Amino acid sequence: MQLKRVAEAKLPTPWGDFLMVGFEELATGQDHVALVFGDISGTEPVLARVHSECLTGDALFSLRCDCGFQLEAALSHIAEAGRGVLLYHRQEGRNIGLLNKIRAYALQDQGYDTVEANHQLGFAADERDFTLCADMFKLLGVDEVRLLTNNPRKVEILTEAGINIVERVPLIVGRNPKNEHYLDTKAAKMGHLLSGN
């Protein structure tokens, strides 16, 4: 295990009451959070989302991405299903950090796409490591997942890490004139499955 379960408390939201579970990475001390809705024990696959931290989209309502829209839609879908988990993965800006994300935004303002901007800053298109999320699922007792994602890479990495993904559930929300190029780039260059949005 790369992390430990540290604390938990109720978290009332507009979609209902979740249990917020805090985790800490053993090597770095970095914290991550799971939001659990309903009873996730048992043998039925759990509806789940691995959501990477996005301060600009999740908290500041940015229209540059679809992250905030996906966060809200995932919580709504989980609550409607009556049970599920959202892992809030603290890897801001596809794990380049907030300040580098702002630098990448500045490059995008100059005409670079999201992948080119990361490359200009010396990063891969996506620096995230989802293997930690498999440990979070395991610590929550979740083995089988219906994963809310448009990113096939998440499915592959979680499967390789021992989580049985029985279904990929599309989460296509939030397209607008400010993020069309960003979403088109994610589909064309990063393999995200965004048809229908």
From Swiss-Prot:
GO terms under cellular component: cytosol
What keywords sit in the KW lines?
Answer: GTP-binding, Hydrolase, Metal-binding, Nucleotide-binding, Riboflavin biosynthesis, Zinc
This entry's comment on the bound cofactor is: Binds 1 zinc ion per subunit.
List positions binding Zn(2+): C54, C65, C67
Which pathway does UniProt place it in? Cofactor biosynthesis; riboflavin biosynthesis; 5-amino-6-(D-ribitylamino)uracil from GTP: step 1/4
Q: Which residues form the active site?
A: D126, R128
Q: Which InterPro entries match?
A: GTP_cyclohydro_II, RibA, RibA-like_sf
- What is known about its subunit structure? Homodimer.
NCBIfam families, sorted: PRK00393.1, ribA
Q: Which family does it belong to?
A: Belongs to the GTP cyclohydrolase II family.
Q: What is this protein called?
A: GTP cyclohydrolase-2
